[in-house]
Amino acid sequence: QSTIDVFETRSNQFGKEILDDYFEQVHRKEKYSINDLLIIRLYLEHIRDRDTDATIYHYFSSLVTHLPNQQEVMDSKELFILRDVILISIGILGDREDYEKIPSLFDALDKIMFLTQDFQKKPILNLLKWKYELHVNKNRDAAQSYFEEATLFAKLIGNDYLVHKIKEDWEEDSRL
């Protein structure tokens, strides 16, 4: 509930006590439980779209380095939360133009989707990959391939609205 409150109100007061009490413990761990992931997700909502000082961003950055390996040690039922935490992390890294860690997160998401056989977020993952290829690697051909795959997966899951939004986003990115 705290995560939803933070997201809806853009106030970082919701869940602050939880973070104050538990985040340092989570930060020191090598393997995360489902509760740890929920605390991390709350933390990510606290720092998303906000200016953060170097210490807070350092905590985030060190957490991100542990995320790709978590899919190997977690129960398959918990991978959906890990997937969402990784997607949010990619957004934060991209917004801060901190691109170095993103490829390993992409790889982890691909593995999670394969292990769970849940491809609902595959169009979004491919959208992020095309943006990475276009803006970071300056590789238009690879970006085009990810765009086509994103569109295909959105059609396969029957989400016409998502197909439309993906095409709109591609048109905007293509103008750059």
Protein language model features and the residues they cover:
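Alpha-solenoid helical repeat architecture
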Residues: 1, 28-41, 54, 70-85, ...
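C-terminal non-catalytic interaction modules
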Residues: 126-127, 131-176
